Amino acid sequence: GMQVRGDAEEIELSRWDKLVELNITAVFELSQLAARQMIPRGGGKIINVASMLSFFGGFRCSPYAASKGAVAQLTKACSNEWAGKGINVNAIAPGYMDTPLNTTIINDPERNREITLRIPAHRWGLPEDLKGTVIYLASGAADYVSGAIIPIDGGYLGR
């Protein structure tokens, strides 16, 4: 995915369009392609990447929050359509993750400290923190799980 930060009234529409194309249109197209292959085979698993910003609006990142909210709703809508065809559609919703998308915030000592103090786990997530949930959702253990948006955020949303 990508991020566009700034005051909502100042964000150029071209930046909005690029972010929406990558963060939601591509997810929809890939889901369609996957479903077209899975339906004749009797099912499968689709795991989307939403965000903790699927649950709240964030600050100075309105295009990103809107697109990740759309991923969550698309996940639920596709689950409603495809669960009866054997396709489980779910999403993980990472919280603050130590990835290049957040380099600016991570490198700002004050902002980094503020965020870390709000995370009950007292640390940023790492990409490897996502794998257990993804493995679960892809496994037979999750055959009755569909339409779920699962936060992986060190407890942030539980506050």
List where the protein language model places each region.
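Substrate-binding pocket helix/loop in short-chain dehydrogenase/reductase
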Residues: 7-8, 12-17, 111, 115
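Active-site loop immediately N-terminal to the catalytic Tyr-X3-Lys motif
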Residues: 9, 56-62, 84-85, 122, ...
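C-terminal substrate-recognition "lid" of short-chain dehydrogenase/reductases
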Residues: 28-31, 43, 123-152, 156-157
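Active-site helix of classical SDR
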Residues: 31, 67, 75
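Alpha-helical segment proximal to the catalytic Tyr-Lys
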Residues: 36, 80-84, 143
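Residue(s) in the substrate-gating loop at a strand-loop-helix junction
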Residues: 51
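Short, flexible catalytic-loop segment of classical short-chain dehydrogenase/reductase
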Residues: 55, 72, 93-104
